[in-house]
Amino acid sequence: MDSNTVSSFQVDCFLWHVRKQIVDQELGDAPFLDRLRRDQKSLRGRGSTLGLDIETATHVGKQIVEKILKEESDEALTMTMASTPASRYITDMTTEELSRDWFMLMPKQKVEGPLCIRIDQAIMDKNIMLKANFSVIFDRLETLILLRAFTEEGAIVGEISPLPSFPGHTIEDVKNAIGVLIGGLEWNDNTVRVSKTLQRFAWGSSNEDGGPPLTPKQKRKMARTTRSKVRRDKMAD
């Protein structure tokens, strides 16, 4: 096992512990709490994959951080902070929409790279809006926290979320997953729109009809998903 992978996990565990203390003292805002919950799931998945105990890793991570801070000067810290671009947290969804539990009548789940796509195949003939919470850097989507598909009545009918055991994803991963989700929803004659905020930071532009400007590759992926479903339906008949 790569030593850098282990030390990175150990430091992440300790930093999560520090952030948890901030929340316990009621010093964190909603986005801070949201990231804390998501990172907790990610750390559990990574710990299981690496075969490492989180509590032990947290103690080792503390030692690593303390050693770095002991050697770090205030001047070097200031220079590092000044030269590092800051991420922004974008919220399409309210805290209630983000944390709400939802259930599927006809569940369908698909893993697309490091992302998990869930869709309720029982939903038909609905107007659906895709909304997401994510971080942005250099005016481009950096990390997807959670994407959900809402009907006009406010019901959740689809979702894209990062896999806890597979940390890290690119903007292309997110766009490909959105293409698969849209293809699945449109198959049942639903009309799908993407929020202007998500269009802006994922594609750098927006369409008046709310449709994302998918690339030819993403359109082919949607077409393959549709053809595969047609074949399965014919076999079932």
Curated annotation (Swiss-Prot):
Show the segment(s) annotated as CPSF4-binding. Answer: 180-215
Q: Where is this region: PABPN1-binding?
A: 223-230
Q: What does this protein do?
A: Inhibits post-transcriptional processing of cellular pre-mRNA, by binding and inhibiting two cellular proteins that are required for the 3'-end processing of cellular pre-mRNAs: the 30 kDa cleavage and polyadenylation specificity factor/CPSF4 and the poly(A)-binding protein 2/PABPN1. In turn, unprocessed 3' end pre-mRNAs accumulate in the host nucleus and are no longer exported to the cytoplasm. Cellular protein synthesis is thereby shut off very early after virus infection.
Q: Supply the source organism for this entry.
A: Influenza A virus (strain A/Memphis/110/1976 H3N2)
Q: Give compartment(s).
A: Host nucleus; Host cytoplasm
Task: Give the family, as the similarity comment puts it.
Answer: Belongs to the influenza A viruses NS1 family.
What residue intervals hold the motif Nuclear localization signal? 34-38
Q: Which GO terms describe its cellular component?
A: host cell cytoplasm; host cell nucleus
Quaternary structure?
Homodimer. Interacts with host TRIM25 (via coiled coil); this interaction specifically inhibits TRIM25 multimerization and TRIM25-mediated RIGI CARD ubiquitination. Interacts with human EIF2AK2/PKR, CPSF4, IVNS1ABP and PABPN1.
Q: What is this protein called?
A: Non-structural protein 1
Domain remark text? The dsRNA-binding region is required for suppression of RNA silencing.
Q: Which InterPro entries match?
A: NS1, NS1A, NS1A_effect_dom-like_sf, uS15_NS1_RNA-bd_sf
